[in-house]
Amino acid sequence: MTIQFLDAVPLTTLSGVGAAISDKLGRIGIHNLQDLLFHLPIRYEDRTRITPIHDLRPDAYATIEGLVQTCEVQFGKRPILNVSLSDGTSKIMLRFFNFNAGMKNSLQPGARVKAFGEVKRGRFMAEIHHPEYQIIRDNAPLILEETLTPIYSTTEGIKQNSLRKLTDQALAVLENIQIAEILPNEFNPHPFSLKEAIRFLHRPPPDVSLEALEKGTHPAQQRLIFEELLAHNLAMQKVRIGTQQFSAYPLSYQTDLKQRFLAQLPFTPTDAQVRVTQEIEQDLTHPFPMMRLVQGDVGSGKTLVAALAALLAIDNGKQVALMAPTEILAEQHATNFRRWFESLGIEVGWLAGKVKGKARQTELEKIRTGQVQMVVGTHALFQDEVEFSDLALVIVDEQHRFGVHQRLMLREKGKQADHYPHQLIMTATPIPRTLAMTVYADLDTSIIDELPPGRTPITTVAISEERRAEVIARVNHACVNEKRQAYWVCTLIDESEVLEAQAAEAIAEDLRKILPHLRIGLVHGRMKPAEKQDIMQAFKQAEIDLLVATTVIEVGVDVPNASLMIIENAERLGLSQLHQLRGRVGRGTTASFCVLMYKPPLGKISQKRLQVLRDTQDGFVISEKDLEIRGPGEVLGTKQTGVAEFKVANLMRDRKMIPTVQYYARRLIVEQPEVATKLIQRWINQREIYTHV
């Protein structure tokens, strides 16, 4: 039997898999036979040979065999079962911190035992804590594994052994079917077929290089990694090509509003802003929708670039919509654009969840009739009740975490008659080039790689929680003596907004007791949008000295007089998020400071993370380091959105393969488009989105 897509085979065809096991496997992304076979081991253990006890090395995993010499219970806070074993070359202690009477009775002196585990140094001899073990009865032969033992990532209720048995069944099914080799030989630079690679990686022979497997460089791994990266790249290219089949309003190059706008600015745009604006203007003249991502570090002036793009659309008699992720940021944009555009005779509308009743109906009517040439808001802009008059450009701020499917949905919502709007996506979270080339291959990318002159560098220091009193004194000095404002950011590792809000309230209360003369405000995710807005407005107008906040202030808030930021539990946040938070200060001409307060002792990864922030303020350098430390899923926020969740590939580890993948993808989509479609269907979950655009 020949099967093109193994995901057509349900898990329930395997023995022992019912609804309960299916649900548990679903938690780790295993929904069908293909998912199970693509759920490759995260590491391997060599249980194919016995190591003499004399030859054991600390921190290595090994299989040993010997006779029990002693079996004793050590009493203390909790009892420990200590079993000494000898094989004639030396002795070792097996230690069990959880044991029962049955284990104690079976491990009596004279019993022959085979055990596997991690070797540790002990006080008197080598030790293995909680080994896997087996009693060898009488003169029964010693049976060893024939292949390396795979270790899988798993979930509660699914043990390693259970997953191995299920994989054995899946491999047996694989033996009896023919999988279509979709990839033609001339497009496959690796010697393994798909079937051979899967079989090899689940059960590698003992003579394979463990080092190659750990590094992901074995040809069997490379075969699967290559095909998966190729499928993703093809999917993005299909979206890009598909976009060019749609119609958009080609905007003619107009300079009237642009020149009047630039003439009223108290500064000159940077060379980078000019370059990126030209790239956008070029795109907007095309008769198909622009899909462009503008990356710029915190404070690089992306809003100005967005304004110039908006003016070109408005000069052509069209409407513009700007969508921001939060009401705070959306209202800030509305205020800025009104200030900039009022003298040009352009009306800027505002639409968010809190605009209700008559005011909302009035705003909707203005949008429908075209009286409002630019409308700013949250995702409320794309609700069914909103009807645009002549929408030509959608600007999406800080939504780089959208996956391609969300970008396509947004495009559909903005469609009018047969025309789709141009899309400009802006982010202040620089995306590492490796990720941009893969995850955002459907977008053209512009980078604003220059900060406006006059920005003051931020001094960043890491201070232990034990010096909290000194930090509070520094806040007091900044607010009282220097007449500056400060942020105090609370972070919780628990994602519960309730707990985070409670922590922020407790800290604000403490600070009010210690600094009663300061005006201290509080903002957190549990507050109503209107409350948050009022507090932020008061902070902006210098009616609040110290703002205690959760990470809701990560994005876009602009208060030039704030020059000190304290981040509690800084070790709990990723580099890019810390960099975003730090970017809330240093927006004026005064020297600014960021204090990363941590709870000791710091782990190695946390030390590395805080050191990077002390060393650099370059968001692109920081994003690359973040990718190295945390991996692509975390950097993109894809734990929530499902962007770039690869089954086999690891973008950091496999980044050198990406240029080769791009070369083959470009050829394949032109020379054999039907093969490209089948590859996408095999590897990508949102099949219908990618293959039918």
Swiss-Prot record:
Function comment: Plays a critical role in recombination and DNA repair. Helps process Holliday junction intermediates to mature products by catalyzing branch migration. Has replication fork regression activity, unwinds stalled or blocked replication forks to make a HJ that can be resolved. Has a DNA unwinding activity characteristic of a DNA helicase with 3'-5' polarity.
Motif DEAH box: where in chain: 397-400
Name the record gives this protein: ATP-dependent DNA helicase RecG
Coiled coil segments of this chain: none
Organismal lineage: Bacteria, Pseudomonadati, Pseudomonadota, Gammaproteobacteria, Pasteurellales
Quaternary organization: Monomer.
Sample GO molecular function, one term: ATP binding
PANTHER family linked to this entry: ATP-DEPENDENT DNA HELICASE HOMOLOG RECG, CHLOROPLASTIC
